[in-house]
Amino acid sequence: MNGSRIAAVGHYQPAKVLTNEDLASLVDTSDEWIRSRVGIRTRHFAGPDEPVDELAGHAAAKALASAGLAPADIDLVLVATSTAEDRSPNMAARVAARLGIPSPAAMDINVVCAGFTHALATADHAVRAGAATRALVIGADKMSAVTDWSDRTTCVLVGDGAGAAVVDACPEGAEPGIGPVLWGSVPEMGHAVRIEGTPPRFAQEGQSVYRWATTQLPAIARRACERAGLTPADLAGVVLHQANLRIIEPLAAKIGAVNAVVARDVVESGNTSAASIPLAFSKLVERGEISTGDPVLLFGFGGNLSYAGQVIRCP
């Protein structure tokens, strides 16, 4: 087997949009305060009648349509999320039922903001090993449901949404479309990003996360490029976890992808956790900012102080 590839992508965001001015009516904040600290202008929020699997299902349906596939063509469903409403049935099974996928392996992966790139690597390994033929990989989170709306340092960050990718085998003779993953974590610092308590609430130690992301992750991201046989200058695109602009911009600069389009979807969508990478990537594809075959670094990081990155070829 030559390897696997991303055959198609899709994304979905709820219709409700909150501006910084809207948030200023809820907590002690302002448009200037938010934009100067995290670079976010707007975010999308799901309603109480829009569960996570509905967001995921919409994105997945778009990816399937783009790939020209029927639900029955999928035999593996992976959903990266940390905001599932229930422990069982899991989100992957719920999405499969929603879409009419008849008998897939269905698994959730909870690595918070790095979940999608972990799930993508898992799908790549499954397809290359022959354990799956076509995988549906989804990142979906409803961060508004786990937000403390009295904490202005976190409630201004979050948004809801989903992104999805179809992963299948590369055509005969083609180069692998998903490069080797570089992943890991810093367990002793896992408390720096948390969703805990009853009901669960998102909290983080912002300065610790910022220092880790901007000092430790650039070298790791460059190593992910090396594993794909590339340098950062070879990249056409960089899609980092959309944490906030104060992290994205220095991290991208230190990686050294001088010729790449850098996704900044956080400005319009906020931090959507596991959804942020597939959501931003799908938008770059949709807008034509990256082209078929272009090398793109996907690099997730966050909760558990986990990270996972790989270079993929644009579908």
From Swiss-Prot:
Enzyme class: transferase
GO molecular function, one term: beta-ketoacyl-acyl-carrier-protein synthase III activity
Keyword field contains Transit peptide: no
Swiss-Prot/TrEMBL GO biological process terms: fatty acid biosynthetic process
Region (ACP-binding): 242-246
Pfam families on file: ACP_syn_III, ACP_syn_III_C
Keyword annotations from UniProtKB, A to Z: Acyltransferase, Cytoplasm, Fatty acid biosynthesis, Fatty acid metabolism, Lipid biosynthesis, Lipid metabolism, Multifunctional enzyme, Transferase
Record CDD domains: KAS_III (cd00830)
Subcellular location: Cytoplasm
CC annotations in GO: cytoplasm
Gene3D superfamilies: 3.40.47.10
Pathway as given in its UniProt record: Lipid metabolism; fatty acid biosynthesis
Catalytic activity of the protein: malonyl-[ACP] + acetyl-CoA + H(+) = 3-oxobutanoyl-[ACP] + CO2 + CoA
Function according to Swiss-Prot or TrEMBL: Catalyzes the condensation reaction of fatty acid synthesis by the addition to an acyl acceptor of two carbons from malonyl-ACP. Catalyzes the first condensation reaction which initiates fatty acid synthesis and may therefore play a role in governing the total rate of fatty acid production. Possesses both acetoacetyl-ACP synthase and acetyl transacylase activities. Its substrate specificity determines the biosynthesis of branched-chain and/or straight-chain of fatty acids.
Record-linked HAMAP family: FabH
Comment text on domains: The last Arg residue of the ACP-binding site is essential for the weak association between ACP/AcpP and FabH.
Family listed: Belongs to the thiolase-like superfamily. FabH family.
Protein name: Beta-ketoacyl-[acyl-carrier-protein] synthase III 2
Organism: Streptomyces avermitilis (strain ATCC 31267 / DSM 46492 / JCM 5070 / NBRC 14893 / NCIMB 12804 / NRRL 8165 / MA-4680)
Taxonomic lineage of the native organism: Bacteria, Bacillati, Actinomycetota, Actinomycetes, Kitasatosporales
Gene: fabH2
